[in-house]
Regions:
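Acidic, PIN/NYN-like endoribonuclease modules and their adjacent C-terminal/linker elements
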Residues: 190-201
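Conserved mixed alpha/beta catalytic, RNA-binding, or beta-rich assembly cores of soluble enzyme
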Residues: 23-158
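Internal gly/pro-rich beta-alpha loop/helix module
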Residues: 11-16, 20-25
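C-terminal beta-strand edge segments of enzyme domains
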Residues: 186-188
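Short, small-residue-biased leader/transition segments that mark boundaries at the very start
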Residues: 1-3
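Glycine-rich phosphate/pyrophosphate-binding loops
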Residues: 162-184
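Flexible, glycine/charged-enriched surface loops at secondary-structure junctions
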Residues: 6-7
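Short beta-strand segments
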Residues: 10-14, 78-80, 128-129, 175-176
Length: 201
């Protein structure tokens, strides 16, 4: 996490699978995010580890890029404040993670990648603790979307992600079937990756 008002992030990227880097972007963190989210300490909620967010972002980006079984899919991951998130959700299926040890259902465990990708085929959100432990999958988010304004053309996943991050101290990552990954914090959205553009933002 950034530690001062002078922090800058250097991003280097290119078209996936091209083997070439063609874009360099330097971002002034304070200037870029404070006007949208607030103070920089609000960017990562209390109790959410940077490692868990980084891993979840990698999984979401991979899903956006490759889909599952040759098909484009959509998915939603909610990270942090899991108890409050859970109060505003309803299971659509029996919880596939019930009864497993924490270390066996943590997204930081590389063996979880295939499980997460497979369960992304079902409707509903993944609810994930701030430390990366997956609480449940297949959850219907029932937070109210009052006073949430989103660009036209976005679906129910985006509306639910905006609403739940507005109502709780969480982060949401949404993968759309068009191959876009969007980050939500405090009801606001930021596009992280778009398959059609072939690069991260």
């Amino acid at each position: 996490m950034c530690s001062s008002d002078l922090d800058r992030v250097c991003c280097v990227g290119g078209i996936p699978q091209s083997g070439q880097l063609d874009t360099v972007l330097v971002v002034d963190v304070d200037e870029e995010f404070e006007s949208v989210i607030g103070h920089e300490e609000d960017m990562l909620p209390n109790g959410v580890s940077a490692e868990a967010l980084e891993r979840l972002t990698a999984i979401a980006t991979d899903l956006a890029l490759t889909g599952r079984e040759g098909k484009s899919i959509g998915a939603m991951f909610i990270l942090g404040d899991h108890e409050e998130v859970y109060k505003r959700s309803k299971q659509l299926i029996l919880n596939p993670f019930h009864g497993y040890q924490d270390e066996d259902r943590n997204i930081l465990n590389p063996f979880m990648d295939e499980t997460i990708k497979e369960l992304s085929l079902i409707d509903g959100a993944f609810i994930v603790r701030g430390n990366g432990v997956v609480e449940t999958a297949g959850s219907l988010i029932q937070a109210k979307a009052d006073n949430i304004v989103l660009p036209g053309g976005l679906g129910t996943r985006h509306a639910a992600a905006a609403a739940i991050t507005h109502a709780t101290n969480s982060i949401a990552l949404v993968v759309s079937s068009s191959g876009q990954v969007t980050y939500f914090r405090k009801g606001r959205m930021f596009t992280l990756f778009e398959k059609s553009a072939g690069r991260a933002f």
